[in-house]
Amino acid sequence: MNYQAVIGLEVHVQLKTDTKIFCGCSTTFGASPNSQTCPVCLGMPGVLPVLNKKVVEFAIRAGLATNCRIAPRSVFARKNYFYPDLPKGYQISQYELPICQNGHLDIEVDGQVKRIGITRIHMEEDAGKLVHADVPGLGSGSGVDLNRACTPLLEIVSEPDIRSADEAVAYLRKLHQIVVYLGICDGNMEEGSFRCDANVSVMPVGSTTFGTRTETKNVNSFRFVKQAIEHEIERQIELIEEGGKVVQETRLFDPNTGETRSMRGKEEAHDYRYFPDPDLVPLVISNDWVEDTRLSLPELPDARRSRYRSELGLSDYDAEVLTATREMAEYFENCLAAGAPAKGAANWVMGEVTRALNEAGKDIAECPVAPARLTALLQLIEKGTISGKIAKTVFDEMWQSDKAPEAIVEEKGLVQVSDTGAIEKIIDEIMAANMGQVEEFRGGKEKVFGFFVGQVMRASKGKANPAVVNELLMKKLKG
Amino acid sequence: MELFELTLHELHDKLAKREVSSVEATRALLARIEATDSRVNAYITVTPDEALAAAEAADRRIAAGGLTPLTGVPVALKDIFVTRGIRTTCGSKILGNFIPPYDGTVVAKLREAGAVIVGKLNQDEFAMGSSGESSAFGATKNPWNLACIPGGSSSGSAAAIAARSATATLGTDTGGSIRQPASHCGCVGLRPTYGRVSRYGVIAYASSLDQVGPVTRDVTDCALMLGAVAGHDPLDSTSIDLPVPDYAAALTGQVKGLRLGLPKEYYLEGLDPDVKRALDAAIETYRGLGAEFVEVSLPHTDYAVATYYLIATAEASSNLARYDGVRFGHRAAGAANLIDMFRRSRAEGFGAEVKRRIMIGTYALSSGYYDAYYLKAQKVRTLIMQDFMKAFEQVDALLTPVAPTPAFKIGEKVDDPLQMYLSDIFTIPVNLAGTCAISVPAGMSAAGLPIGLQLIGRPFGEETILRAAHAFEQATEWHRHTAQL
Ligand SMILES: [Zn+2]
């Protein structure tokens, strides 16, 4: 029998606010344990939460970018369970009335566009974390670090519209790109800023009844998501083929084996006893707030890509690469704003700039060559002042120093030679010195042409205008 | 007259005239606690050193001309208020060793006003109880008759006032926890409108019902205390951003033309004869002062107690989850694993009444029962609120009993929780409606126990009920009666 997978994803996005969702503590990652806490995030007796408006702002941004409806009134609820890193014995989350609902994202897999529904986006607080064994000052016990407690999260829940691991990854990549673009998440998956729970089930092809699903928790890389889902689909099909039954349970992905394993079964499932948090009044969001936020949104990758294709005439590939991150796109657009030609800027940003950044292990935001400087360089090429090849030398110099390209060209005497008389003189000398090759060319061995071009360029120290060289050389060689 | 016998405003006047210093008043109070509290058990913690230091600071402040109504006044707080550096138990073994790292908003306001905190008062554990018997630190006794309960849960707040071992106190009122003990102990007790006083730093029992309020010797003191602690707090999202009126200025003595409602559902056939007699006399007093009476109906009153015990316990089951032995408070020794540690710490740390309510609340919120219990209770709560709003279209305030009977004997209802729950039948609807109410002394039972009357105001109508209570107080002598200890 053939099977069809049904996948829904729950993505946890850690928000890049300076302070926590219900108190004023810092959210900086990596501080010493419990140094970023106060009575509120410690869940001390008597404390009350106060909602951070920035978190709401970020949630609205995420909702608008994913085509959701922003609820004019939403409610915080308590999710009650016991765990040592959960200071209050409940997590404040949204339940029945979340801030965003009924959105969607379009993904592209194998050239096919597909729409994935987004059920809801809600705000919640993170828990702390447990540190086991060798805790400084505790010996071999377990310690609780509550620095992360009360850190703001968005949970973005998809509809079970995803049908393969590739679609899941495409959806996740897209979501990741959007939240980073929006400036609401640093996107750092290793630090857990963007992590995913995958709900997977299988059913016979053509069936309309979903099979029993499992939930694989906290997968934090695109590669692992693909592996985890593929393994889970395979495991469930095998189980059914062998006459077994899939049990509804929570599973963990083991990156070492590429497999998922059972974490807890349904019999241990929690009754979270959700109810509206009486310490927080319902959140009312005005239409003006939503519309102001809509106006402040950056242009999102999809819109940018299609604009690059239609208005700038760039290829699909170029548009894709240039919009991969907001910083990359902004760098590119700053070049255009400074007067760079679109295609030239695209080639240079994707070529030399990216190469140099990779070699230096730098991000485009830290690029030492400012867009205006790169544009000036491109303009020197356009005007014919320097050749594209020389430009690479100039670029390397710009990377090292803080000099303008014009200054470098002048200082090093790199101005391109387009003067036909000077070039003719070089060609004559080289032809005279290589009569054998001239004969070969004239005998029909046209490959030798390249040899002459190389010789002329070398003799001119790369400064000869290649177009002029080609033209004159062809004329002279043909006699 | 002894210094400890002075009301807050009398002491304030003496401090203002420099007839007495705060240190003298504080010493007198500490001596009174020493002399009475082994019998009354109103205090869990007495803080003489901190109090005398604060009194000295208050005297310096008074000398510098910085006197406010509370400067230099010895006050005591229900042990539900979180106090920085001072053990805060909430009447529970599970918090028996808890020393908070912060002050709540109300405590900070009192300190800023220069009040002298002399100690932390006994209470029913986590404010759950109507008799003061369910404290892990032993039952509080009624100073009028040590064999009787003082009422609860703010048992120590009322008993200390009656015993003259605090000049003024603060309690909390979730279902009547200020008004009912104030009534049983012959004090004035006010439950302000929900949102009027910050709950930040008040250990939560039922968040949507809890409210901070004063217990005092007379209505003037009550107005002064409320003025000192009321107001918007950015740390409490449910606190309301409204200006705080000058409550003391509202005490004009005038009730002529005031329309008082008598809810027919509150005047039951079986009302205790002493309570009935006191109310009838109070109505006559008000008539004599020119107030008008209107019979009104609060048709959903019958459902109030059941509704309260679903909502309060549901919220409590969640609010009390943090007491799990992990980070503070009592942790059971020798647990086999994590779950066992949670389970045993809570089993050892909580008393019977708290456990009973956590169980009820957990049940009411559990899947499959949520709609039938919690959600239904919320709907009834809305109906009860609407009852009050309709009544307030006709009248300025309601006049009702506070408790169905005067204080009962210690131990009398301990084994009958349902009977005990009914002792809050006249106070609970106010909490569900989120409005304000005051209890003032209005009589004595044949057995020599105080009886209070309740005035219920519209939301943020504290000035009206304070004015009405004050006028009644001026026309009667009940607040001058003193328990003999
Ligand atoms: Zn904090």
Curated annotation (Swiss-Prot), chain A:
Which UniProt keywords are listed?
Answer: ATP-binding, Ligase, Nucleotide-binding, Protein biosynthesis
This entry's Gene Ontology molecular function terms read: asparaginyl-tRNA synthase (glutamine-hydrolyzing) activity; ATP binding; glutaminyl-tRNA synthase (glutamine-hydrolyzing) activity
Enzyme Commission number(s): 6.3.5.-
Any one Pfam family match given in the protein's UniProt record, by short name: GatB_Yqey
Q: Does the keyword Transmembrane helix apply?
A: no
Q: Which domain of life is it from?
A: Bacteria
- Is the keyword Nucleotide-binding in the record? yes
Q: Which GO terms describe its biological process?
A: glutaminyl-tRNAGln biosynthesis via transamidation; translation
Q: Which family does it belong to?
A: Belongs to the GatB/GatE family. GatB subfamily.
Matching NCBIfam families: gatB, PRK05477.1-2, PRK05477.1-4, PRK05477.1-5
Whom does it interact with, and what assembly results?
Heterotrimer of A, B and C subunits.
Q: What is this protein called?
A: Aspartyl/glutamyl-tRNA(Asn/Gln) amidotransferase subunit B
Curated annotation (Swiss-Prot), chain B:
* Keyword Cell membrane among UniProt keywords: no
> Which GO MF term does the entry hold, naming one?
ATP binding
Which domain of life does the protein's organism represent?
Bacteria
Say yes or no: keyword Zinc present. Answer: no
> Under the cellular component aspect of Gene Ontology, which terms does the record hold?
glutamyl-tRNA(Gln) amidotransferase complex
Q: Which InterPro entries match?
A: Amidase (IPR000120), Amidase_CS (IPR020556), Amidase_dom (IPR023631), AS_sf (IPR036928), GatA (IPR004412)
Q: What is this protein called?
A: Glutamyl-tRNA(Gln) amidotransferase subunit A
